[in-house]
Amino acid sequence: MELTPREKDKLLIFTAALLAERRRARGLKLNYPEAVALITAAIMEGARDGRTVAELMHEGTTVLSRDDVMDGVAEMIPEIQVEATFPDGTKLVTVHHPIV
């Protein structure tokens, strides 16, 4: 199977997000890479589902709360930018303060 670098990145993000979901389900607090992967994957999947950039900017702030992450992680992520593929092309989605 031949994958482009972008496809490899998407697969890596999805894998990290899946691991984060499992750890969260077990009651573990997520670390920085897990939190970023989970929020990023939610945005990418939302774009694939046809949601708008504005909807995803809001949804990105609801994926995780401070209770879901280790101490200090929320402060380490002032914003997340995701280049997501929408039905009408690729767009940049920026989520400010994704963990509140």
From Swiss-Prot:
GO biological process, one term: urea catabolic process
The keyword Hydrolase is annotated on this UniProt entry: yes
Record's keyword terms, sorted: Cytoplasm, Hydrolase
Molecular-function annotations in GO: nickel cation binding; urease activity
Pathway of action: Nitrogen metabolism; urea degradation; CO(2) and NH(3) from urea (urease route): step 1/1
Pfam families xrefs: Urease_gamma
EC number: 3.5.1.5
InterPro entries per record: Urease_gamma, Urease_gamma/gamma-beta_su, Urease_gamma_sf, Urease_subunit
UniProt main location, coarse: cytoplasm
Catalysed conversion reaction: urea + 2 H2O + H(+) = hydrogencarbonate + 2 NH4(+)
Keyword Hydrolase: yes
EC top class named in words: hydrolase
HAMAP family: Urease_gamma (MF_00739)
Subunit description: Heterotrimer of UreA (gamma), UreB (beta) and UreC (alpha) subunits. Three heterotrimers associate to form the active enzyme.
Similarity comment: family membership: Belongs to the urease gamma subunit family.
Identification of the protein by name: Urease subunit gamma
